[in-house]
Amino acid sequence: GYLSFLRQLKQLEGVRQVTLTTNGLLLDARTMDELKDIGIDGINFSIDTLDSKKYAAICGQDTLDTVLKNLLYGVSVGLNIKINTVVGPLFTQSDLESLIDFCGNLPVSLRFIELMPLGSNKRENRIEEVQSYFASHYNIEEITERLGNGPAHYIRIKNMKCVIGFIEALHHKFCHECNRVRLSSTGSLKLCLFHKNSIALKPYIGNEIKLEEVMRDAIYMKPEQHHFEDEQSGTVMNQIGG
């Protein structure tokens, strides 16, 4: 299963960090203990709201209580936990306040992510609304040092354990720092979330030398930047693998 896969990844020479992005539903205490034993470097929980009805509408099932229980157990055993919240059209101030209340006294990162114009998503930067809320309601401090390997920029709030991060792929490009590629659920290597071009890797499974060669060549073709601002992709994130 995936736990065995993660353990093997951690043991590979040259692999410096392995993190997991998940909805958290199946990460019960036993699984969290095994992830701790594997040495997982971080777990990102995708949680867009703490309203159980809204959560069920987004995810298709009412599992929020289980997800939060799993998250809190992960925190209790010392795992590096981040919460990723996409600021979509249904995101409200009530959602924001609930997330702050939940995370405030936890040693976690709460990151607000700009909705990318994929599928039917519209171009609107609601991250600015979130940033304005923090600026007007809290005593905040910009964190100048880099936290982790990702593109988020962070702030601290006085008297809170959590740190707050913002990721704005469209309105504050970070393409010049991006060193990521994505393997889709269909076995294709995407060099950029937006670009339509991808490289099929399935034909090379079983030939490790050729597979490595194709992947190395592909990485050198990574686009210099995305063009979300010019046109909209019809692809949705769950088709890509995120």
Predicted regions and their residues:
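Auxiliary Fe-S-binding modules of radical SAM enzymes
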Residues: 101, 105, 115-242
